[in-house]
């Protein structure tokens, strides 16, 4: 199964397989989202990258999409259908009743499907209260209690968003590369911004996980994901990093939702019209 996570920073493509009966996923490639690209342009690009990754049309029996960029959802879905002959299923609130996590109102009305996928993957893995930290365009924290209820979400500016904002919102601060410095005391402007933004985010993550545990009233497992989570891979005494968490969640969800309950326009193999 082809898994697609359409986000604000990247469109991530992965493929699902099984290992000893367990769901496993492999990221294939990432694209920069571009609303100016046509369906045909996306189709040619996705086809070429799938071929390069060794994934032919015969391997794409089904496709499952999460998207938080509505303007791209149909374009990407139709591009995949054009290549594979399979109309992707687009994950949405229609599937929430069939998940191992529960989503109460008003969270249900606004939570992104990527965060739901994260919560599903984490809860299936830990089977206990957990906090998922996603380091993407936004820095998000999703808290799930021991019964599988999503208690809430916190959203802060992401790392790249923060450095871009400092650059565009000031007269002299440069656009600095993202890196984790050893010290919080910068010796030049680049180091100072990296210390404040990247190492500062590290402290925010630790503090927010601790506060989530306090508000949930229990110790929680924690996991870090997102395209920029790699910046913290050298940290000790830090939650594990799982860059494939969102794709893993989509794979679990795709297996859990009965085909008979899929919206007619998104049943795999339908015309999609």
Curated annotation (Swiss-Prot):
It catalyses: (R)-pantothenate + ATP = (R)-4'-phosphopantothenate + ADP + H(+). One of its GO terms (molecular function) is metal ion binding. K(+) binds at residue 134. Homodimer. It comes from the Bacteria. The keyword Acetylation does not apply. It is found in: Cytoplasm. The gene is coaX. Substrate binds at residues 112-115, 189. It comes from Treponema pallidum subsp. pallidum (strain SS14). Disulfide bonds: none annotated. Catalyzes the phosphorylation of pantothenate (Pan), the first step in CoA biosynthesis. A monovalent cation. Ammonium or potassium. Its cofactor is NH4(+); K(+). Keywords: ATP-binding, Coenzyme A biosynthesis, Cytoplasm, Kinase, Metal-binding, Nucleotide-binding, Potassium, Transferase. The lineage of its organism: Bacteria, Pseudomonadati, Spirochaetota, Spirochaetia, Spirochaetales. This is Type III pantothenate kinase. SUPFAM superfamilies: Actin-like ATPase domain. GO terms for cellular component: cytoplasm. Its EC number is 2.7.1.33. It is an enzyme of class 2 (transferase). The active site is at 114 (proton acceptor). Belongs to the type III pantothenate kinase family. Pathway: Cofactor biosynthesis; coenzyme A biosynthesis; CoA from (R)-pantothenate: step 1/5. Gene3D superfamilies: 3.30.420.40. GO terms for biological process: coenzyme A biosynthetic process. The keyword Cell division does not apply. It holds the Pfam family Pan_kinase.
């Amino acid at each position: 199964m082809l898994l697609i996570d359409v986000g604000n920073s990247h469109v991530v493509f992965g493929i699902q397989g099984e290992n000893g009966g367990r769901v496993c996923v492999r990221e294939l490639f990432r694209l920069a989202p571009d609303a100016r690209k046509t369906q045909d342009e996306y189709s040619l690009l996705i086809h070429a990258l799938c071929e390069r990754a060794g994934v032919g049309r015969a391997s794409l029996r089904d496709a499952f999409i999460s998207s938080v960029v509505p303007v791209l959802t149909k374009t990407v879905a139709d591009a995949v259908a054009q290549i594979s002959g399979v109309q992707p299923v687009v994950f949405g609130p229609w599937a929430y009743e069939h998940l191992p996590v529960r989503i109460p109102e008003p969270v249900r009305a606004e939570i992104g499907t990527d965060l739901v996928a994260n919560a599903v993957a984490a809860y299936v893995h830990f089977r206990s209260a957990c906090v998922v930290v996603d380091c993407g365009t936004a820095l998000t924290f999703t808290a799930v209690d021991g019964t599988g209820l999503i208690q809430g979400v916190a959203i802060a500016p992401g790392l790249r968003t923060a450095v871009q904002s400092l650059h565009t919102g000031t007269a002299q601060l440069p656009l600095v590369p993202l890196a984790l410095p050893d010290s919080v005391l910068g010796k030049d402007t680049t180091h100072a911004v990296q210390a404040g933004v990247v190492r500062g985010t590290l402290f925010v993550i630790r503090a927010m996980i601790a506060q989530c545990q306090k508000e949930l009233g229990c110790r929680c497992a924690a996991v870090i994901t997102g395209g920029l989570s790699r910046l913290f891979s050298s940290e000790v005494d830090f939650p594990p990093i799982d860059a494939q968490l969102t794709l893993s969640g989509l794979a679990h969800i795709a297996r859990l939702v009965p085909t008979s309950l899929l919206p007619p326009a998104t049943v795999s193999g339908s015309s999609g019209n």
